[in-house]
Amino acid sequence: MTKVTTKFKEIRKAGTAPSLEEAQAFVGGLVETVHLPDDSLLIINEEGKLENLPLNPLATALWHKHFGPTDEIVGNAIHLAKDARGEGWS
C-alpha cells in the first residue's frame, strides 16, 4: 500500500504571497480561495474532491477551527496569515 501525503504551507511574512502560477503548481490545479474569519486565506485545489485527492489533516483542522466540522479539505493547501504585528502577506 502506498502512503499518500498532502502538503500544508503557511505564509506569514509580508510580501511573500505566491503568484497565481505558484499557487496553482502547489495545489496541483485550479485554485479556490477560502476567506477565513480571522482575515486569513486558505488556498486549495478547486477540484480536489472531484479528483479524489487525499485528506489534508492540517487544512481540515484549520477549517474546523473556524467553521466547525462542516467539511474536509483535500489535497495541498496554502494558508496566508498575518504575522504577530497584524501585517499582511500581500
Which residues fall in each region the model found?
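Short beta-rich binding modules
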Residues: M1-S90
